[in-house]
Amino acid sequence: VCEARLMTSRHIVALGGSLLRPEESEKRSEWLGQLRQLAVHLEGNERKIGIVIGGGLPAREAIELAKNCISSSEKLDQVGIAATRLNATVIQQILLDIGCNVAPEIPHTTSQSAELLEQYNFVVMGGTTPGHTTDAVAVALARDAGARTCIIATNVSHVYDKDPRQFDDAQSLTNLTIDQLAEITGIGEPLAPGTLSLIHI
């Protein structure tokens, strides 16, 4: 297994839910088309990719709706996690449709995803545990899978030390280790349902 990991590079990508559902439908179709092309290219270069999908606006809207009847933060988080898994299923089926070697299930844990990456070129998952953002899940998966890189793909250009939309003095961070990224994403520190972390946009 160790030799196989050295021969085939592993990378983890966190896709913010906002990237999957831009306001204009043409942009959405264009983006998904580009994703398909990229997936074919990556698979042809013997890369293994773990993809963690965020819930985006659908998750936040569902949580807002459920708040009228549910007071439990954990139950509200489960609503958001369900939205991430729905988005993950969309990406999984798109990749299966073009013939990529994709895990046939949406894993519930990062350890399960890491095991599936031994067998498949692509593993797609959503959220896992109430209180954790999908960015934090991606960093945890990078650790579990021994990935070379963890890419946070969102609608903000950099990772910042605080929300650049609220703070003019927010500093962009260009180079981070997995451990530093884990600290920023708040692995092990629960957040309120629907809350955005520093890089969960």
Model-identified regions with their sequence ranges:
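Short, well-ordered secondary-structure micro-motifs
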Residues: 23, 62-63, 135-136, 161-164
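Active-site rim beta-loop-alpha module in soluble metabolic enzymes
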Residues: 158-196
